[in-house]
Amino acid sequence: MLDNFDLLGVKISVTNLAKACQAIEDWIKTGRRAYVCIVPVATIVNCQDDRQYREIVNGAGMNTPDGMPLVWLGRMKGYKEIDRTYGPDLMRKFCALSQDRGYRHYFYGGTPETIKLLVSKLREQFPRLNIAGYFAPPFREIREKEETSVLGQINAGRPDILWVGLGSPKQDYWMHDHRNELDVPVMVGIGAAFDFIAGVKKQAPLWMRKSGLEWFFRLCSEPKRLWRRYQIGRAHV
């Protein structure tokens, strides 16, 4: 059972990579259905303006702290074991341990090119990884028949874990909305992890990730896409 603390009405789980992997594995073993939100500061900000989104995030089985400010706050509250639980690192670590457990993985999100690169990289890094399937949805609004077909494909693959890379908040809404239609123990909204692991986008240097400056690296890398996210966050602060 994970401890949680409240930050501006948003649940943050007291976790680290090892504890997060253990929680996911426990849910797979028990068959409990849960979704996991990877929570950076931007998600906290978005939750302040959107009550429905806040309820969706708070309904997750685990909200991992994906940002050093959240880790620092948790440690100030006395949770010494809390550490940044970064999406790409969580995905790599769970894929690594899955090789000996036989857990089945399904990947949903990204572009057709990115997801093929992702699967290729994962098979290269984790040769015994059991990949149940993958699908990149179209950028346009997906039609109801298409959605039904994709959900059927996912269920037919019998995955133990579904990695959802649609970006936040879209992936969090998607997991919540389809949680009762999918026979999958665990879904994880993994954000840009598909792009990073596939090698499509560069990750910030480790020192920037550890010092809480990854946002600056990403803003410089993708100013047109991310300026609004970080400007809104600064305005709230």
Describe the function of each predicted region.
Residues A235-V237:
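Conserved small/polar residues in nucleotide/adenosyl-binding loops
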Residues A136-I142, P185-S221:
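Short, flexible loop segments at boundaries between secondary-structure elements
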Residues M1-D89:
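N-terminal nucleotide/polyanion-binding subdomain common to many enzyme families
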Residues V71-Q153, G157:
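Conserved beta-alpha
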Residues R51, E55-G59, D172-A192:
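A short, gly/pro- and small-residue-rich
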Residues P40-I44, L166-Q171, A193-F194:
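Short glycine-rich anion-binding loops that position phosphate/pyrophosphate groups of nucleotides
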Residues I154-S168, V184:
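Proline-aspartate-enriched helix->loop->beta-strand connector
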Residues G61, A132, D160, P185:
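Conserved acidic residues
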